[in-house]
Regions:
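Glycine-centered coil/turn sites that cap beta-strands in beta-rich domains
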Residues: 289-317, 334-335, 339
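Aromatic-lined substrate-binding rim segments of carbohydrate-active enzymes
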Residues: 2-58, 120-147, 192-202, 206-208
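C-terminal tail/sorting-segment detector
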Residues: 299-300, 305-307, 344-364
Length: 364
């Protein structure tokens, strides 16, 4: 199955596509971006464009100027940012691609286009470059929302420093974007505390700047999929709890990366190239947030290889000890288990009332 088609089947409804200025291998340049954006558009997915303003990865540890821009002063960089942003978005618009959000910079917690746009060196330069990108976006897509994206969504001091700095220097933005990775939290993988701190930060950003907030990146190790699902389910729930309804979405970064792809272990596919149970957090999300886990009566009949229930459910899923969905059925009061090996399984049952129930069953 093609990647975007598969992710859409898992109830993901939006895609975030990065673009580099002049990458050496061509991946993530404007032409490559157009191919991916067309694919997403044809699937009816909502689209975010993520400008790195670099020839390769830009992140908190590096914000390297594109090779062609290295000699530019501030005014030259403002012009280059505006032209690059305008040119890429015009290409998409001319191909009838609807763009809903645009990031001007990627994880710019200390600015971008170092050293000129490094926030700790010159917040005013960083604000000017951000505004150059913002204005260029609005020229092409007046209704697109522009995102300034910062890492460590739990770090309120960092966010106040950056957005106070932008505000005081004439910076423009529509949405505050956050990354949240529990592996980077003060206590590694303490996702509950990370999520709590992130929600507090999101609410503070809404109060302080009256801007929407969005989780534009998150992830957790692929080999603790059940934990990752709990993290994501809670994060999605908390984002929907942001005051005044101003939490606008959650994106998983590179969910399709698997195992130890290029040294990255925070994807959500296993070593066989299949999505893990973590991504179930995105399924039917408006409904799932209101579900309540309870036990229910379950019966296993080895003779006919069947699990049966005392009521009919909208959907039933059987999950292995490894966290994989191994059986599903809809509108049913039983499910055949003939193809399953002996062992312990979790059965999730979604009632027509919208209530989710869980039970453990031993097949022998």
């Amino acid at each position: 199955t093609e990647c975007m088609t598969l992710l859409k089947s898992l109830d993901m409804n939006a895609v975030r596509l990065r673009v580099w200025v002049n990458p050496t291998d061509g991946w993530c340049n404007a032409a490559d971006l157009l191919v991916k954006a067309r694919r997403a558009s044809n699937l009816g997915m909502r689209i975010m464009i993520d400008f790195h303003y670099s020839d390769s990865w830009a992140d908190p540890s590096k914000q390297t100027k594109p090779a062609a821009w290295t000699t530019y002063d501030l005014n030259g960089l403002k012009t280059a940012v505006a032209n690059h942003t305008r040119d890429v978005l015009t290409l998409l618009k001319n191909n009838q691609i609807a763009v809903e959000w645009v990031q001007v910079g990627n994880e710019t917690g200390n600015g971008m286009l170092w050293e000129t746009g490094k926030a700790s060196v010159s917040m005013s330069n960083y604000a000017a470059l951000t505004t150059a990108g913002y204005d260029a976006v609005k020229e092409v897509y007046p209704n697109a929302k522009v995102i300034v994206h910062i890492h460590n969504g739990y770090d309120n001091n960092l966010f106040r420093w950056i957005f106070d700095g932008l505000k005081n220097n004439g910076g423009k933005w529509d949405i505050i974007g956050m990354s949240l990775y529990p592996s980077w939290y003060t206590v590694k993988n303490d996702w509950q505390s990370a999520n709590n701190a992130c929600l507090a930060n999101m609410n503070d950003m809404v109060t302080r700047y009256n801007k929407e907030v969005m989780i534009v990146e998150c992830g957790m190790s692929w080999d603790i999929a059940a934990t990752a699902k709990s993290f994501l389910t809670d994060l999605i729930s908390k984002t929907k709890q942001v005051k005044n309804g101003m939490g606008t979405g959650v994106f998983y970064w590179e969910p399709q990366s698997y195992g130890n792809w290029k040294g990255y272990t925070l994807g959500a596919f296993d070593n066989s190239g299949r999505p893990t149970v973590a991504l179930d957090a995105f399924r039917n999300i408006t409904e799932t947030l209101q579900l309540k886990a309870e036990t229910f009566n379950i019966h296993y009949n080895k003779t006919v290889a069947e699990i049966s229930f005392d009521e009919r459910f909208r959907k039933v899923s059987v999950i292995s000890a490894a966290g994989k969905i191994v059986l599903t059925a809809e509108n049913t009061d039983s499910i055949e288990t003939r193809q399953l090996s002996p062992g312990t399984y979790i059965v999730n049952a979604l009632a027509y009332s919208g209530k989710e129930s869980k039970a453990k069953v031993l097949l022998y």
